[in-house]
Amino acid sequence: MQEIGSTILRAARDELYLGMRFLDVALSSFSYQMDGQVHGFGTDGRVMYFQPQMLGGLYRENRILVNRGYLHMVFHCIFRHFAWSGTEGKKRADDGITIQERMRDLSCDIAVEHMIDGMNYRSIRFSRSLLRRETYRLLEKEGKTLNAQRVYKILSEWNLNEKDLTNLEQEFRTDDHRYWESKKPDQKPNPMLSRKWGEINDGIETDLETFSQEAGERDGDFLEQIKTENRSRYDYREFLRKFAVFHEELAVDDDSFDYNFYTYGLRLYGNMPLIEPLESKEVKKIEAVSYT
């Protein structure tokens, strides 16, 4: 069962790669592990866990559904949805999951599915339900990039009742989020995992902007989502440091000044310090910034 499930997931990975070579590293960043407790499949950012009977049934129904599920999990990782948590509100009596947590899960799923549905590749092309089309129409009214955080903000303003929330969850839920860091508050977050996916994210943006002539035609708003994500997390101070160079400038160099010799000279000769501080020092600065 382990081998069959792994074979199905590898086949999905390979089919996705044929059309989306800019995702090569992301698609190949997982090992595969059978887990009888998972609902379909899910990932923690390192391993894709699958329930063999459900995965096999999905593949027999339509392999495109497996392809979409694989890409869905990859996008969760690219945008680090697994690490998104927040202040919890009142808990539900039946399963202990907060409304806020359900809304975050739903927002992540909608954001990912919206990207997938906006991409024009045969390997993931699938008909959209009326509920899905109407949800997208309402979300797109603002005309802004629909990342998970923005979707969450809009959904919160809708004041969804239980029935509407459940209907949306059933429509957009694709994978099991139980393995996410945000679902394990007692477990220390792994900064290396977020850094790994951040670097993959950067590489994808570079590939799309530099090599993909069809970006924006077949990839929908995926590139714009990547740019938005990177802008929100990029440390521009670190970026500017790359352009700093060492040069000399006129200033007292206190760092190279030795007070021992200075005070010794004053003690020995009265008013003659043995060493004066240097009148220039090396500094690392950006010499000029040009705005165009």
Q: Model regions: which residues?
A:
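Short, functionally important secondary-structure microenvironments
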Residues: M1-N67, V74-L278, E282-V283
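A short alpha/beta connector and helix-capping loop motif
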Residues: E287-A288
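Conserved small/polar residues in nucleotide/adenosyl-binding loops
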Residues: Y291-T292
